[in-house]
């Protein structure tokens, strides 16, 4: 059983106590580590906004060709108006992450080889990690909400075997490369470098990497770029144009406030984030339904 000391902290186990004298044995090394976050969806980050609040997405439709009529004075002299579509987004998630600490309390727990600055630095890291983890979970929620507006992949939206799933993913990726309006509002093609497959770690761990590379005709290095892994346990695979989903940032400001009368330090991170889903760009999903 862990030993609970009178300051409320928990020791690893009772063997840190000297059996002869009952005191805690000398600590020979103290490792200081902050909790870290990993955002596998940070490729959706569209950058920082310096001024303004409103995001405008503008899409220009593909022009319609006409048959050339020799001798005609109408069709090939009359150009149609460019068809431009716009969407506007202005809902920012304004938030602040913070942690406080007391230098004198930190000194009480450090050995002679450590400094308060080392601990303070890791506290600041933990603040940033908390913010990054929130963005990651927000993006997973955004995908789930956007799914309701997406059209499932038509060729085989519910493959029953892993082999069928891989073939369906390949078909979806190929379909995105051609000009069509099947999974977006207006006819367009998606450049290969903009296509991403978002898949759960639970599902991709069941797939043989060699078979995956062979089926999609890509090498292992390209797999990491094409596939974005998320820590979910569902069987939904999203195929998206990276422009269909994204987030912008503004007011990113990290600072530490010193409160001398209280002998306290507080680290803050201000960070506003705007998330969006735009159907001008292709997005679809496949649901793996094993037999």
Give residue spans per PLM region.
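Generic structural signal of hydrophobic/aromatic residues within well-ordered alpha-helices
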Residues: 1, 17-27, 32, 106, ...
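Sequence/fold signature of self-assembling virion shell proteins
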Residues: 2-24, 175-178, 183-291
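Alpha-helix boundary/N-cap detector
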Residues: 8-15, 19, 23, 97, ...
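Intrinsically disordered, low-complexity regions
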Residues: 9, 23, 44, 48, ...
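Assembly/oligomerization interface modules of large self-assembling protein complexes
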Residues: 18-101
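Context-gated lysine
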Residues: 29, 46, 75, 83, ...
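Alpha-helical scaffold segments that mediate packing/assembly in large oligomeric complexes
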Residues: 99-180
